[in-house]
């Protein structure tokens, strides 16, 4: 994107004027933004993201941020000499690992992002799904085919959960006081056990419960790509399911798109998968005619 210092004052005014209809469209609407990918590890990118979140709040939008932390968790586990195993794209989380995961997600990452947003002039509050019993989870299960026996087996993922219930009491209070919730994807079972939850899945559950206007999933890829590796700007749920069935959508993109479909079916009006490494990706998506990434809708 062109640096603002190289744009004439007239062009800057024109850009702001063209953004006005989009600002009006999202006035007093809730936008859930899942911030993840390797862009989180870059301080300048993280601070730019924080400024964009503050801008949303200043334009009468209600932003709710959910963050991931896979690379940072991996770095900490490696530093401590703990080897991670993965199954079906999810980290197998034992008792020792869940303590580290909670420390990294709810501690260092969450508070750092809260600090960046507050430094930019916002009023962010750092929480996780455990706070106020916001997100209840059940133990996640996955099956995999054994390569030797070719028999499908259930994989024990340990303390990995999937959202089962979202209580909006605390979130609605924060939004009502014009505070910016920043959520780490941790939840508890009804028995009080802490679970690590995939950040996309967590964001989808929160967005669905809030009936958000938009759910934005910031990732390391431009969006959903066709078989020629070109960006698909917009697809319906029906089209998305066809692309999964024919193999166009594959690998790690499948659970992301399934999260999008779930959120839409729960009442979210539109979900966008976009590249978090693109400067001001959130603003480009919400405040420009062309947007960015892939919009999935009903």
Swiss-Prot record:
Catalytic EC class: transferase
Species for this entry: Bradyrhizobium sp. (strain ORS 278)
ATP-binding recorded as keyword: yes
Any GO BP: L-arginine biosynthetic process
One Gene Ontology cellular component: cytoplasm
Biological or metabolic pathway of the protein: Amino-acid biosynthesis; L-arginine biosynthesis; N(2)-acetyl-L-ornithine from L-glutamate: step 2/4
The protein's name: Acetylglutamate kinase
Chief place of localization: cytoplasm
The family this protein is said to belong to: Belongs to the acetylglutamate kinase family. ArgB subfamily.
Protein EC: 2.7.2.8
Compartment list: Cytoplasm
Reaction catalysis annotation: N-acetyl-L-glutamate + ATP = N-acetyl-L-glutamyl 5-phosphate + ADP
Keywords: Amino-acid biosynthesis, Arginine biosynthesis, ATP-binding, Cytoplasm, Kinase, Nucleotide-binding, Transferase
């Amino acid at each position: 994107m062109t640096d603002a210092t190289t744009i004439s004052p007239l062009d800057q005014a024109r850009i702001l004027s063209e953004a006005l209809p989009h600002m009006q469209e999202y006035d007093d609407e809730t936008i859930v933004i899942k911030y993840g990918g390797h862009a989180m590890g870059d301080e300048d990118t993280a601070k730019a993201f924080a400024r964009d979140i503050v801008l949303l709040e200043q334009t009468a939008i209600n932003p709710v941020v959910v963050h991931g932390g896979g690379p940072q968790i991996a770095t900490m586990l490696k530093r401590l000499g703990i080897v991670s195993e993965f199954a079906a794209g999810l980290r197998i989380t034992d008792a020792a690992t869940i303590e580290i995961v909670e420390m990294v997600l709810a501690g260092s990452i969450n508070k750092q992002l809260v600090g960046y947003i507050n430094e930019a002039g916002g009023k962010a509050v750092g929480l996780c799904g455990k706070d106020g019993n916001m997100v209840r989870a059940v133990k996640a299960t996955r099956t995999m085919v054994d390569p030797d026996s070719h028999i499908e087996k259930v994989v024990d993922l340990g303390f990995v959960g999937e959202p089962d219930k979202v209580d909006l009491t605390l979130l609605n209070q924060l939004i009502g006081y014009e505070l910016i919730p920043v959520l780490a994807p941790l939840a508890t079972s009804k028995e009080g056990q802490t679970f690590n939850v995939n950040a996309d899945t967590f964001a989808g559950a929160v967005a669905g419960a809030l009936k958000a206007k938009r759910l934005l999933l910031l990732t390391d890829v431009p969006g959903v790509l066709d078989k020629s590796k070109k960006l698909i700007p917009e697809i319906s749920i029906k089209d998305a399911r066809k692309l999964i069935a024919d193999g166009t959508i594959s690998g790690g993109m499948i659970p992301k798109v399934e999260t999008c479909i779930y959120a839409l079916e729960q009442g979210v009006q539109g979900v966008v998968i976009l590249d978090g490494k693109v400067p001001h990706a959130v603003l480009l998506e919400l405040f420009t005619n062309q947007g960015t990434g892939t919009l999935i809708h009903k």
